[in-house]
Amino acid sequence: MRNKKLRFALKEHHATRLHYDLRLEKNGVAISWAAPKGISMNPQETRLAVRVPDHPLSSLDVEGTRRRGLYGAGEVLTWDKGEYEAFSVDDDNTLTVTLYGEKLRGIFSLRKKLGDNPDWYITKLEDEYSDRKFILVPRLKARKYRGFEPLFELI
């Protein structure tokens, strides 16, 4: 069953470690996953996506620095954004979405690991947007460190 197009964002998050936050608008919140290695456009690469608590819809647009000591502290930038279409979750706990982003386009499968585990796996499905040479390049790079607070510059 197809739904109307809703918003999505992939956030580049330089916290304790660089990771990417996938956010999908649904029922008034942004359902969220933390993806340590981001999302690939290569159908041969499956990436881990750990389900995290839902975020407010405003998290789809937020960029900037969250100060140390707060949940999600660190630098956050939008790596990609756009709309998506979702299909029903099937019996295997798989959510199939079509992303219409600036960089992420086409059909992706999010498959939940069985049991109470928060782990999901995200894979690009083969379509006209697949790119077997895809390399996810961060927008920020660390230039130096003072204690645990990295300073960043745009690449």
Regions found by a protein language model. Give the residues of each.
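A charge-rich, low-complexity, intrinsically flexible signal that marks solvent-exposed coils, linkers
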Residues: 1-155
